[in-house]
Amino acid sequence: MSSSNACASPSPFPAVTKLHVDSVTFVPSVKSPASSNPLFLGGAGVRGLDIQGKFVIFTVIGVYLEGNAVPSLSVKWKGKTTEELTESIPFFREIVTGAFEKFIKVTMKLPLTGQQYSEKVTENCVAIWKQLGLYTDCEAKAVEKFLEIFKEETFPPGSSILFALSPTGSLTVAFSKDDSIPETGIAVIENKLLAEAVLESIIGKNGVSPGTRLSVAERLSQLMMKNKDEKEVSDHSVEEKLAKEN
């Protein structure tokens, strides 16, 4: 192992602010109900539809990421503007498939039944898989389990649906009747494609929340630039130290 690798320190946890979206507050960091890892707020936005000329908001969505997402994404995407990232399909695919934990908090603005919510989510997931040519029996069974988890649930305004996506591909589902986040989930589905598709259906190319997509792009653009600047300062300090030692 080289001396530079031996001296490398873990990336600092990103310092971010909370976000207020349509009277819903997303705190700067949360503990994942799947792993208890701290995750930072990557972005937030609304999901709504234009109904008879009026934009109706159904849910407000926050996306949280593990701290190592920033250096991982920085390798390819640092220096890109918010606009460039927002328009980049590969960038959001890398977030969706990246080897770091993700967490999604979906807070209700209007009441929804579990059946209404889960059927729409799985419909979007299946559309993504078919587009990618990835729909198999395993995914069909994962969809059945997903629908079963939600079948008897109802979600009044202010309640939340929570998803934790592990780097290994499991999807942990949890529910909250208020703003709290439970320490553990109520069910785990071991299907990597389903876990990824749930997130992609929100922030991907045809995702249901363009506002969340824009928010994630804006925040990560800033964080990657900050990470780049800090790394350059750190590298310069190491070079100075080595020069003095020699």
Swiss-Prot record:
Pathway: Secondary metabolite biosynthesis; flavonoid biosynthesis. It comes from Arabidopsis thaliana. One of its GO terms (cellular component) is chloroplast. The record marks 117 as: Important for catalytic activity. Induction: By light. InterPro entries: CFI, Chalcone_isomerase, Chalcone_isomerase_3-sand, Chalcone_isomerase_bundle_sf, Chalcone_isomerase_sf. Belongs to the chalcone isomerase family. GO terms for biological process: flavonoid biosynthetic process; response to auxin; response to UV; response to UV-B. PANTHER family: CHALCONE--FLAVANONE ISOMERASE 1-RELATED, CHALCONE--FLAVONONE ISOMERASE 1-RELATED. It catalyses: a chalcone = a flavanone. This is Chalcone--flavanone isomerase 1. Catalyzes the intramolecular cyclization of bicyclic chalcones into tricyclic (S)-flavanones. Responsible for the isomerization of 4,2',4',6'-tetrahydroxychalcone (also termed chalcone) into naringenin. One of its GO terms (molecular function) is chalcone isomerase activity. It is an enzyme of class 5 (isomerase). Mostly expressed in siliques and flowers, and, to a lower extent, in leaves. Substrate binds at residues 59, 124, 201. It comes from the Eukaryota. Its EC number is 5.5.1.6. Pfam families: Chalcone (PF02431). The keyword Isomerase applies. Keywords: Flavonoid biosynthesis, Isomerase. Part of the biosynthetic pathway for all classes of flavonoids, a large class of secondary plant metabolites, many of which are brightly colored.
